[in-house]
């Protein structure tokens, strides 16, 4: 039976785990900066070498403190080690051996699985000298690399894969590039301001402590993708960094995190914007909703921390939401408590419904029949002496559903009539939780630009008709 080995990257913060992750997966999925503690959750990625496949797990650094966020970060790293077939223990060749390295090594030596000591940042220094002091850790397999420049990375992964038999091969004919897990699944991005409960919601939806949750704004720094299956359907949940107002973003790392959050939204198919019920919908929430609407993704709102609120406060939140979302009445709203699980189960049905609507399939004949039904009951308004004529329609794309309507003089259609068409198509197609876009294309007139030469008799008749109309 073939297998795809799982390789876990562990070590102190800022030793280059995310840089190596990006090298091994040939992506830039992991956020990288010269800043300790940047990665705080497990991040998965697939890679291949010579047609052989493997999965890499990036983890948060195992911290030296016993309190604060280092504790859950360490827990995430230990879970990754438990899932892995191979462990790559990374150390900093420039910083040398530290007490934290010794402590981590003592735990890894107890594991009944292959563990390799990877001495990173050996560029510009003598590799043998950099490696020498790390032999004291008692790990027999010691490999030097420079992840930032890619030196030694290929030979390292070749050596590691040699320890496996019956490796899974890339299917014949498939393009040999890295493929992210969950690429063929329903991709759901969870967005919101800092500390509104995004990670708690994802953990509740997954049923495990998968994403680090800490009662401090800005816990999630990178966009974390979690692939899994539910009732035979594949999903990828994407936890993102909280997006604050631009004036409150001071750290460069946080600016990168916001960019990654918006990129995650672009890569998703369904976006769930989480709002804090205690604060109601804020201007920043509306900005986030604006980003989501501009992206054209299926969209829903989860109003979190709903439990424990007074009835009059709940009513104020409902009224305010309805008033401020008048521009997008199709957006579905669910009131939940991520901490206690209230209403979270219903989100799955809403996600599936929104995805099905965003990727609707319909033939040209059926869509044209719908268009004729709409225009026969309510034809386009006359513009001067002429009326626009819609002839046929077809599906131009998905996520969002894009309907292309062909006809004559479509540029003369007023905005109000285009909005009417959008609402009627949404109603007939039963689209829920997704925007819809209409594109209008006018046919070319083969006689446009030619001078219309009339005979004397035609000129006389035309003058007579104009004179009669003036009476």
From Swiss-Prot:
Signal peptide: none annotated. One of its GO terms (molecular function) is ribosome binding. Keywords: GTP-binding, Nucleotide-binding, Repeat, Ribosome biogenesis. It comes from Alcanivorax borkumensis (strain ATCC 700651 / DSM 11573 / NCIMB 13689 / SK2). It comes from the Bacteria. Belongs to the TRAFAC class TrmE-Era-EngA-EngB-Septin-like GTPase superfamily. EngA (Der) GTPase family. GTP 1 binds at residues 11-18, 58-62, 120-123. The keyword Transmembrane helix does not apply. GO terms for biological process: ribosome biogenesis. GTP 2 binds at residues 192-199, 239-243, 304-307. NCBIfam families: GTPase_EngA, small_GTP. Associates with the 50S ribosomal subunit. It holds the Pfam family KH_dom-like. InterPro entries: G_ENGA (IPR031166), GTP-bd (IPR006073), GTPase_Der (IPR016484), KH_dom-like (IPR032859), KH_dom-like_a/b (IPR015946), P-loop_NTPase (IPR027417), Small_GTP-bd (IPR005225). HAMAP family: GTPase_Der (MF_00195). GTPase that plays an essential role in the late steps of ribosome biogenesis. Residues 360-444 form the KH-like domain. The lineage of its organism: Bacteria, Pseudomonadati, Pseudomonadota, Gammaproteobacteria, Oceanospirillales. Residues 5-168, 186-359 form the EngA-type G domain. This is GTPase Der.
């Amino acid at each position: 039976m073939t297998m795809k080995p799982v390789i876990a990257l562990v070590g102190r913060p800022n030793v280059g785990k995310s840089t190596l992750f990006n090298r091994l997966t040939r992506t830039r999925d992991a956020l990288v900066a010269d800043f300790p503690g940047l990665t705080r959750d497990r991040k998965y990625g697939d890679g291949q070498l010579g047609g052989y496949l493997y999965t890499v797990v990036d983890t948060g650094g195992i911290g030296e403190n016993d309190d604060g966020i280092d504790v859950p970060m360490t827990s995430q790293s230990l879970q990754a080690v438990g899932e892995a077939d191979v462990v790559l223990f990374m150390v900093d060749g420039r910083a040398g051996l530290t007490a934290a390295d010794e402590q981590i090594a003592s735990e890894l030596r107890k594991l009944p699985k292959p563990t390799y000591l990877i001495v990173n940042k050996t560029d510009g220094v003598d590799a043998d000298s950099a490696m020498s002091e790390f032999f004291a850790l008692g790990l027999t397999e010691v490999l030097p690399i420079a992840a930032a420049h890619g030196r030694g990375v290929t030979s390292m992964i070749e050596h590691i894969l040699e320890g496996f038999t019956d490796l899974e091969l890339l299917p014949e004919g498939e393009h040999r590039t890295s493929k992210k897990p969950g690429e063929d699944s329903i991709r759901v991005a969870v967005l919101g301001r800092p500390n509104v409960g995004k990670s708690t919601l994802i953990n509740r939806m997954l049923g495990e402590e998968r994403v680090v949750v800490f009662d401090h704004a800005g816990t999630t720094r990178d966009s974390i993708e979690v692939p899994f299956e539910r009732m035979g359907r594949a999903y990828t949940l994407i936890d993102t960094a909280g997006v604050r107002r631009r004036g409150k973003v001071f750290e460069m790392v946080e600016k990168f995190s916001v960019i990654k959050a918006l990129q995650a939204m672009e890569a998703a198919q369904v976006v769930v914007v989480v709002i804090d019920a205690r604060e109601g919908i804020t201007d920043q929430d509306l900005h986030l909703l604006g980003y989501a609407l501009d992206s054209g993704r299926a969209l829903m709102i989860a109003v979190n921390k709903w439990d424990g609120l007074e009835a009059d406060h709940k009513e104020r939140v409902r009224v305010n939401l309805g008033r401020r979302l008048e521009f997008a009445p199709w957006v579905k709203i669910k009131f939940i408590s991520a901490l206690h699980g209230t209403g979270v189960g219903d989100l799955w049905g809403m996600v599936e419904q929104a995805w099905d609507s965003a990727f609707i399939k319909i033939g040209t004949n059926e869509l044209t029949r719908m268009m004729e039904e709409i225009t026969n009951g309510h034809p386009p308004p006359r513009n001067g002496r002429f009326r626009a004529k819609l002839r046929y329609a077809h599906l131009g794309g998905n996520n969002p559903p894009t309907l292309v309507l062909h006809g004559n003089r479509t540029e003369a259609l007023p905005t109000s009539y285009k909005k009417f068409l959008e609402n009627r198509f949404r109603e007939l197609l039963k689209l829920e939780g997704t925007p819809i876009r209409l594109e209008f294309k006018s046919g070319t007139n083969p006689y446009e630009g030619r001078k219309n030469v009339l005979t004397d008799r035609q000129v006389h008749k035309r003058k007579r008709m104009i004179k009669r109309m003036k009476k």
